[in-house]
Amino acid sequence: MDERLGELVTERRSPDSAELDRMGTGELVRLMAREEARVPEAVARQAPRMAAAIDAVVERLRAGGRLIYVGAGTAGRVGVLDAVECGPTFGVPPGRVVGVIAGGREAMFDPRESAEDSAEAGASDLDRLCVGPEDAVVGVSASGRTPYTLGAVRRARERGALTVGLSCNPGSRLSDIVDHPLEVVVGPEVLAGSTRLKAGSAQKLVLNMISTISMVRLGKTYGNLMVDVRASNAKLRDRARRIVELATGAPPEEAAAALDRCGGEAKVAIVALLLGVGPDEARRRLAAGSVRAALGEGRRP
């Protein structure tokens, strides 16, 4: 065990929760709510670094590369959670946004705590994905020292990929080996060392921002509407129709009919209705992927 582990911010004992087991339930709720409220502030302090990292990720995605999250334990699960949501939300094809967790798929539901200790396993998992210069790899580790994550990120660098490191400690090992270090320091946890709490919340918030903002930049939205939504169930089909209504001002029946003509693709239906063209012409105009570009509109600089 690393003798310096106890010196990490994420391992320290918070004086505010030193009497945790003696507090009443209401007091505990208020304490945890106060602590969680620190998370957005810590994330906001990294805004300039995050913007630079996201712009670099977008370059890789625009060139056909992948966004790959890698981590162990909570950090790995948060990455998988964000990755799997990108398909239905933004219509990205399988394998474009990937979550890799130490211990494999089983570790999502059954803890494989020892899996994080192998840097070789991290490197091997990246090799299996055939990571290359066109990809962006985001290593996630609250401590910034998890061997599995460090091994994966080092291998990603060796293979020429863009690397981003997300940790919750200042001056972490992870920060030292990536192109874009993000250090979201949220302070000691209410339950000392339990980084599934504030650190986990911070990781989820940052990954939400990386994926969502990247998709916005790639034209996967029109305004704040998810126009590339994959209408794969009743709820999402209804949402797609409402999106077409909101974007075009068309009544429900007209929006539904346009969606049917356009194979359920909200983006195509919007362009077809607004420009008065058929589905094929709408798809041609959407070749660059952006509704605004298809309509001849620009975005703010």
Swiss-Prot record:
Reactions it catalyzes: N-acetyl-D-muramate 6-phosphate + H2O = N-acetyl-D-glucosamine 6-phosphate + (R)-lactate
Which Gene3D superfamilies does the entry mention?
1.10.8.1080, Glucose-6-phosphate isomerase like protein, domain 1
Query: What enzyme category does the UniProt record give?
Result: lyase
Q: Where is the SIS domain?
A: 57-220
What are the alphabetically sorted keywords of the record?
Answer: Carbohydrate metabolism, Lyase
Q: Does the keyword Glycoprotein apply?
A: no
Q: In which pathway does it act?
A: Amino-sugar metabolism; N-acetylmuramate degradation
Q: Which PROSITE patterns match?
A: GCKR, SIS
Transmembrane regions listed in the UniProt entry: none
Name a Pfam family for this protein.
Answer: GKRP_SIS_N
Give the UniProt entry's GO cellular component terms: cytosol
InterPro entries associated with the record: Etherase_MurQ, Glucokinase_regulatory_CS, MURQ/GCKR, SIS_dom, SIS_dom_sf
| GO BP, sorted A to Z | amino sugar catabolic process; glucose homeostasis; N-acetylmuramic acid catabolic process; response to fructose
Relate the assembly described in the record.
Homodimer.
Family the entry assigns: Belongs to the GCKR-like family. MurNAc-6-P etherase subfamily.
Query: What's this chain's function?
Result: Specifically catalyzes the cleavage of the D-lactyl ether substituent of MurNAc 6-phosphate, producing GlcNAc 6-phosphate and D-lactate.
Q: Look up the further comments and give them.
A: A lyase-type mechanism (elimination/hydration) is suggested for the cleavage of the lactyl ether bond of MurNAc 6-phosphate, with the formation of an alpha,beta-unsaturated aldehyde intermediate with (E)-stereochemistry, followed by the syn addition of water to give product.
Q: Write the protein's name.
A: N-acetylmuramic acid 6-phosphate etherase
User: Which gene is transcribed and translated to give this protein?
Assistant: murQ
